């Protein structure tokens, strides 16, 4: 019924258009009964179907969704921290992905290929799993602690960072690390990122030369 009314409207509207208008000859032929159509008349506020005066009109047609165009549903998000280029089906990868039905070998192959140039680093990855068992993933930057240890040339941080210092990095090294971590930090400037990374370094017993943070002062009770 709606389709029939629409065809009648289009035919009547087409006949009321200016005789030389190309739209008047093709409007009815081009509009699909499956399309959602909005017809807007521009000009004086009077019925266009009852007037013999030519009218301009705007036709907005929206095509129906394509077959199979249904959006995928996210069924899980998995976060892992893996060594670059060395992902295998062994834990933690296998159990984490297997429980969601993800193709484990396909993930390992893709992850290793995308991190091959970062050998020696731990690269966090966030995997989004969909209801059809397909997946996508994004790589994060290495943890700041890993970058700081690499820059300082030490294997681990200090158990007592205030008293036992394990290494020193330069201000240029700090800036390089801050620039790399900036996309994952809750700040927008390199200076703010440097202060955040410097705080992490201080908690690990790694000094910055020259320092950019004021030393903590112990409160003295009188």
From Swiss-Prot:
UniProt cross-references to SMART domains, sorted A to Z: RL11 (SM00649)
Example GO BP: translation
Database matches in CDD domains: Ribosomal_L11
Top-level taxon in the UniProt lineage: Eukaryota
GO molecular-function terms, A-Z: rRNA binding; structural constituent of ribosome
Principal location class: plastid
DNA repair recorded as keyword: no
Listed SUPFAM superfamilies: Ribosomal L11/L12e N-terminal domain (SSF54747), Ribosomal protein L11, C-terminal domain (SSF46906)
Keyword flag DNA repair: no
InterPro entries in UniProt: Ribosomal_uL11, Ribosomal_uL11_bac-typ, Ribosomal_uL11_C, Ribosomal_uL11_C_sf, Ribosomal_uL11_CS, Ribosomal_uL11_N, Ribosomal_uL11_N_sf
NCBIfam families per UniProt: L11_bact
Function statement: Forms part of the ribosomal stalk which helps the ribosome interact with GTP-bound translation factors.
Protein name stated in the entry: Large ribosomal subunit protein uL11c
Organism of this sequence: Arabidopsis thaliana (Mouse-ear cress)
Gene field: RPL11
């Amino acid at each position: 019924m709606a389709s029939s009314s629409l065809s009648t409207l289009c035919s009547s509207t087409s006949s009321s258009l200016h005789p030389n208008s190309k739209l008047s000859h093709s409007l009815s032929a081009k509009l699909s009964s499956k399309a959602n159509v909005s017809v807007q008349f521009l000009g004086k506020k009077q019925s266009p179907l009852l007037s013999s005066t030519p009218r301009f009109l705007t036709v907005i047609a929206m095509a129906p969704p394509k077959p199979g165009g249904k959006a995928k549903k996210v069924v899980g998000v998995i976060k892992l921290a893996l060594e670059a280029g060395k992902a295998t089906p062994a834990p933690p990868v296998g159990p984490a992905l297997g429980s969601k039905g993800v193709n484990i070998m396909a993930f390992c192959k893709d992850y290793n290929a995308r991190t091959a140039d970062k050998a020696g680093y731990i690269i966090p990855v966030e995997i989004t799993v969909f209801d059809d068992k397909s997946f996508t993933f994004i790589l994060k930057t290495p943890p700041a602690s890993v970058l700081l240890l690499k820059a300082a040339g030490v294997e681990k941080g200090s158990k007592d960072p205030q008293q036992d210092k394990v290494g020193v990095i330069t201000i240029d090294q700090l800036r390089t690390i801050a620039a790399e971590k900036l996309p994952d930090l809750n700040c927008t400037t390199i200076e703010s990122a440097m202060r955040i990374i410097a705080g992490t370094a201080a908690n690990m017993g790694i000094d910055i030369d020259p320092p950019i943070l004021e030393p903590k002062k112990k409160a003295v009770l009188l």
